[in-house]
């Protein structure tokens, strides 16, 4: 009848309705009682509760309910692989994530491999944003089975939107690194040259990402950048690259530019070739890794990249 009867510490018997905030069960029986009261048929919870599952189920069944189906997910870890703890303050809150990326990127991150412990820290945000939009772009070309396995189908209840991200989030961070933009309108000058049909009005996801990218860059990338001077081999290769760019007549074709950058590294004897690209990132962007450099040139601009190389070789970035 929705009441609970108990004896208090003085031996008096009380009967109270369980509604209206009169009672609160201890946390272990609360799970099972809630399942029975609300006819819960599916419950997911962290693995720290998994050892108590038989207790929860037993309480639910004792109250006349049917234990729900369970899904137990792994816990999130911090950057160093330690369990996230409120007392340590080593976690990344939802509000913090949403200060640097759209809600859907967080949903995408959480969807991935729920039974695997995932490191959740600020550095994973750009990757989550770009992978989410990759899945959006792939969705229209997929078979029904592939679409049902695509996270965006579940995130958007079968009706995922069309991605209007003409520039990846990671590339926006690199653009912010060299563009000196104070607000997203400064980034849009480069974006529109790269994708003339794009605009803040026609590409709201892109516009939002541009604002997020500037904030993320200023808070996390800029304080950690470390520029260095090039080695003799790198200097010769960068001078060659700048010379080829000065006479470049291939437009803003990212693939053609990437092929040319690749050829410069090969001709200057970089082995493995990864060392050539690492040198470009460290000398020009102050980072140990970065985008496909041809795509970066196409977005930032050929003349602007020549000028950037000149400043780096002159030691002005160090």
What are these regions (language model features)?
Residues 56, 102, 280:
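Residue-level signal for inorganic ion chemistry
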Residues 199-252:
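Aromatic-anchored, charged helix-turn/loop surface patch used as a conserved interaction hotspot
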Residues 229-282:
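C-terminal accessory/binding modules appended to enzymatic or scaffolding proteins
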Residues 35-44, 88-92, 242-246, 259-266, ...:
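Glycine- and acidic
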Residues 1-88, 94:
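Active-site cores that bind ATP or allylic diphosphates and position pyrophosphate for catalysis
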Residues 61-68, 271-272, 315-318:
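Secondary-structure transition/capping motifs at alpha-helix termini
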Residues 70-73, 108-112, 121-124, 188, ...:
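Short coil/turn segments at secondary-structure boundaries
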Residues 48-53, 74-215, 285-318:
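Catalytic adenosine-cofactor/nucleotide-binding cores of aminoacyl-tRNA synthetases and other
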């Amino acid at each position: 009848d929705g009441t609970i009867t108990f004896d208090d510490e003085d031996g008096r018997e009380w009967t109270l309705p369980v509604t209206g905030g009169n009672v609160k069960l201890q946390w272990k029986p609360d799970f099972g009682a809630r399942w029975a009261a609300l006819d819960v048929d599916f419950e997911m919870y962290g693995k720290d509760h998994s050892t108590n599952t038989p207790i929860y189920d037993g309480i639910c069944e004792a109250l006349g309910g049917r234990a729900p189906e369970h899904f137990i997910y792994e816990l999130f870890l911090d950057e160093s692989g330690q369990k996230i703890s409120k007392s340590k303050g080593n976690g990344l809150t939802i509000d913090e994530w949403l200060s640097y990326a759209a809600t859907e990127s967080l949903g995408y991150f959480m969807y991935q491999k729920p039974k695997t412990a995932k490191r959740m820290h600020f550095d994973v945000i750009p990757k989550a944003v770009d992978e989410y939009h990759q899945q959006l772009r792939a969705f229209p070309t997929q078979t029904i089975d592939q679409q049902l396995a695509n996270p965006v189908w579940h995130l958007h209840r079968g009706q995922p939107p069309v991605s209007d991200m003409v520039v990846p989030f990671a590339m926006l961070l690199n653009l912010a690194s060299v563009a000196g933009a104070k607000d997203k309108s400064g980034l849009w000058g480069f974006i529109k040259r790269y994708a003339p049909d794009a605009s803040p009005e026609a590409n709201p996801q892109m516009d939002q990402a541009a604002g997020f990218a500037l904030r993320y860059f200023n808070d996390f990338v800029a304080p950690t950048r470390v520029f260095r001077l090039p080695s003799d081999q790198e200097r010769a290769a960068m001078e060659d690259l700048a010379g080829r760019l000065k006479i470049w007549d291939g437009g803003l074709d990212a693939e053609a530019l990437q092929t040319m950058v690749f050829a410069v590294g090969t001709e200057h004897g970089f082995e493995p070739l990864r060392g050539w690209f690492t040198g470009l990132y460290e000398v020009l962007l102050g980072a140990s890794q970065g985008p496909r450099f041809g795509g970066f040139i196409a977005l930032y601009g050929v003349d602007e990249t020549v000028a950037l190389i000149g400043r780096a070789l002159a030691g002005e970035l160090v």
